[in-house]
Amino acid sequence: MANNVMDSSFKKEVLESDLPVLVDFWAEWCGPCKMLTPIIDEISKELQGKVKVLKMNIDENPNTPSEYGIRSIPTIMLFKNGEQKDTKIGLQQKNSLLDWINKSI
């Protein structure tokens, strides 16, 4: 299961991570976000030890999404070595996400 990350812990949990980090930006009121949750949780289990998977609620943590220009959700960002590597916007299929992650890391 993916852990939550907050504005206050984003730098430590994401930018300073030794592992690549996948961040799912979401909101409680977002239907596609809710549909993506089980997919993100499965990916978190499958890639445990290879990729850190985190979720950020944009309503509770407005600063980080604003810094990264997030205008639509769900938005999934992949970070590696403290830098944003790639972004996917909208509901994604599990296999498509896994392929994307594996190519990006």
Swiss-Prot record:
Gene3D superfamilies: Glutaredoxin (3.40.30.10)
Disulfide cross-links: C30-C33
Disulfide bond recorded as keyword: yes
MF terms in GO: protein-disulfide reductase activity
Coiled-coil region list: none
Keywords, sorted A to Z: Disulfide bond, Electron transport, Redox-active center, Transport
PANTHER family for the chain: GEO12009P1
Main function: Component of the thioredoxin-thioredoxin reductase system. Participates in various redox reactions through the reversible oxidation of its active center dithiol to a disulfide and catalyzes dithiol-disulfide exchange reactions.
Entry-linked NCBIfam families: thioredoxin
Protein name (Swiss-Prot/TrEMBL): Thioredoxin
Species assigned in the record: Rickettsia conorii (strain ATCC VR-613 / Malish 7)
Record lineage: Bacteria, Pseudomonadati, Pseudomonadota, Alphaproteobacteria, Rickettsiales
Gene: trxA
